[in-house]
Amino acid sequence: RHWEPTLRAEAPDETGQPETVLALATDIAVVDHVSGSVWLIANAVNVDDKSTRADAAYNEAVARLDQMQRDAATPAPDESRVNILDETVAQPELRFRTEKSHYEQAVERAKQYIVDGDVFQVVISQRLDIDSPADPFDVYRVLRTLNPSPYMYFMALTDAQGRDFNVIGSSPETLIKVDNGHAMTFPIAGSRPRGATPEEDEKFAKELLADPKECSEHIMLVDLSRNDLSKVCVPQSVEVVQLMDIKRFSHIMHICSTVTGKVDPSLTAFDVFKSAFPAGTLSGAPKPRAVEIIDELEPADRGIYGGTVGYFDFSGNMDMAIAIRTAFLRDHEASVQAGAGI
C-alpha cells in the first residue's frame, strides 16, 4: 500500500509485529557451510560523509576486525544438545486463528471473485499460534535439522516499543535477487510430498508435472514474474531461462522456474524490490486486486507472512527471500502462517 495509493489495509493487527525492521550490518561473519570457511568483515562506514572522517572510519573498522578475530578464536561455552525427540516434553497445542467453517467460507468467496473476473488467482491463509517455552535459537537449530532450505534465518530484533522478538525461518523461495546488474526471480508453484522411495518420488514428480491445475497456476505466476521484471529491466532483456523444473526439498517438491533480466542502469535494487513486492505466489494475480481481497477475507493482518527477509549490499546487489515457513516469536509464543492458492 505504500506505493499503491488506492490500497487500504483494514484487517486488524492482532500480533503487533512491526511492519519493517532495517539494520545496518557493520560487522559480519560469513560462513561457507560447504567448505567450513569463515570470512570476517568490518565495514568502514563513514556516516558523516566527510573526507576528514574517512581515515577514522577505516581505523575503527580495523580495530573491530581485530576484536572479531579474537572473539572467533575464543572457544564457545559447552552448551547442552537439543533432543528433538524428547517424548517427556509435553506437546503444546496449536491454536487456529480461523475456524474451519470460516476458512471454507473465505475460499468460496475467493472462488466467486475468480468467477466474476476480479482475479485469476488469490492466496487465502490463516495463522496458527502455539506456546513456545524453548530457547528461540534451539528452535532454529531444530528447524535447520528437520527442514533445511536455501534460506535459513534466525533474527533477534527489538521493535519500536523496546520489545524483543525473533524471526525464525527456512524459506525455499526467492522474492527477487539482483547480482551485478542482473535481476532474477524464481517462481515456485505446484507441490507434492516427497516419496518414501525413489520410485514413488519420481511418480509424484511426474504426477505434478501432468497436473493441469498446478501447471496452469505455475505458468500464470511465471508470466507475473516476467511482468514484474519488465517494469525495471532493459526492454527485451527479460527471459525465462528455466521453465517448470522439479526442485526437491526435505519434505516436499515444487515446480520451479527462473526469470531474469538486465536492470535498467537508471534504477537501483530498491526499484527492483518495489516492482516485485509482494510476491505473486503469496498474494495472487493481478496483485493489487488480490491484496484487496486478502485484506477483506482474512480476519487479521498477516504480519511477516508473505513479506521478505534479506539484504541490500553496498555494491547495489540484493537478495530477498519470501517469508514463508517462518515463525514470529515473542513472550514465549510463536505464530506461523500458511496459505493455499485458489
Describe the function of each predicted region:
Residues 1-342:
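Extended alpha-helical targeting/anchoring segments
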